[in-house]
Amino acid sequence: MAQLNPRQREAVRYIDGPLLVLAGAGSGKTSVITEKIAYLVNTCGINASHVAAVTFTNKAAREMKERVGRLLRGNAAEGLTVSTFHQLGLRIIRAQRKELGLKSGFSIFDAEDTRTLIRDLLIQQHGAE
């Protein structure tokens, strides 16, 4: 935590409720988040399985996982969730699959899958064009 400035250290140590960290690119947001996770687990005794860090890109999620892995001792990171919003959503859907009425092995369409399905249905309905 030595590399953090006083405001960043304050954010890491704040545990009395939600905290919003707003800062520009390259300002150390990922460092604050990873240090906060380590602080919660190592200092506050929070089980890592009760912590989730969510980001927008796979690259950022990988980087965050690597950084947290370097900060946590032993198997302290076991159960920690670090993922993208899409990965977390899919994980929740898979965990609740039965309650949602989904079959095992369901798939989620991306934009290309959707276009292909619509094209195939139009061809089926109206003939090849």
Regions found by a protein language model. Name each.
Residues 1-104, 108:
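P-loop NTPase Walker
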